[in-house]
Amino acid sequence: MVSTATQIGHFSFDNCLMNAAGVYCMTKEELMEVEKSQAASFVTKTGTLEVRPGNPEPRYADTRLGSINSMGLPNNGFRYYLDFVSDLAKTGQHKPHFLSVVGLSPTETETILKAIMASDYEGLVELNLSCPNVPGKPQIAYDFETTDQLLENIFTYYTKPLGIKLPPYFDIVHFDQAAAIFNKYPLSFVNCVNSIGNGLVIKDEQVLIKPKNGFGGIGGDYIKPTALANVHAFYKRLKPSIHIIGTGGVKTGRDAFEHILCGASMVQIGTALHQEGPAIFERVTKELKTIMVEKGYQSLDDFRGNLRYKD
């Protein structure tokens, strides 16, 4: 029997597919739609210390090859999502979940994570170090010194399962430098990648979105090659205890298969989920299992990370 079951840290999942933060996760109702689908889990909207309305609209647009957005981290505040995942966990009848959070300063991040430490929530936390769409706030994980200092401080007080959402890296030396930092800490996972920041899409001589004069994060087909490169680069560099979540350009079982082949333990779907809805998880799971059967693979472990190189 072909299985797409997987594991992140000490958490087991009966499937390897889930939503990406930012899609179908703003409200409890949206999260429950993902919960009731064939997705293995859900990740919440990235929660900040306070409620945020986000950037002015229009701030999202579908494009021929994917999407562009400058949402600006709209969310209901981290406590809204923390309370929700905590309540679900207490029932004992739900899947393990991911709580996505970030502060707009190191102090805010510390306040949020200490509140999670003090809570009943024992699930996974995804710290978003890679949002490209908050005006005046750089993507933290591009600053290696700041990232190192932030993680060093976090792990002086935070002992629950924690992973980080990364921006895409484009230089081999940056993979080396980033991995050297991440390997110093007890991270449960890294998520590769967030959208490629500050793209520009034009139609009829005009930009598609309003914030930042049309500059926004690019998702969908555009970013799959970059996402696969990041997944594989970190798979080859990170210690085995740090699992990898692959995100970027996934809309078919073949896409998911390639992320796992590059080293991903789980795969998140963003743009295609926004376009197709939670039914996508059933379709992509079936397509992935079909590929596995054709190739004689019974489990993800049979091919994870087994990308072949040219002689």
Swiss-Prot record:
Role of this protein: Catalyzes the conversion of dihydroorotate to orotate with fumarate as the electron acceptor.
Record-linked CDD domains: DHOD_1A_like (cd04741)
Oligomeric and partner information: Homodimer.
Gene responsible for this protein: pyrD
Pathway entry: Pyrimidine metabolism; UMP biosynthesis via de novo pathway
EC number: 1.3.98.1
Annotated compartments: Cytoplasm
GO MF term set: dihydroorotate dehydrogenase (fumarate) activity
Name of the protein: Putative dihydroorotate dehydrogenase A (fumarate)
Binding sites annotated in the UniProt record for substrate: 45, 69-73, 128, 194-195
UniProt KW keywords: Cytoplasm, Flavoprotein, FMN, Oxidoreductase, Pyrimidine biosynthesis
Note describing how the cofactor binds: Binds 1 FMN per subunit.
UniProt-annotated binding residues for FMN: 45-46, 128, 165, 193, 220, 248-249, 270-271
Needed cofactors: FMN
Sections of the chain in a coiled coil: none
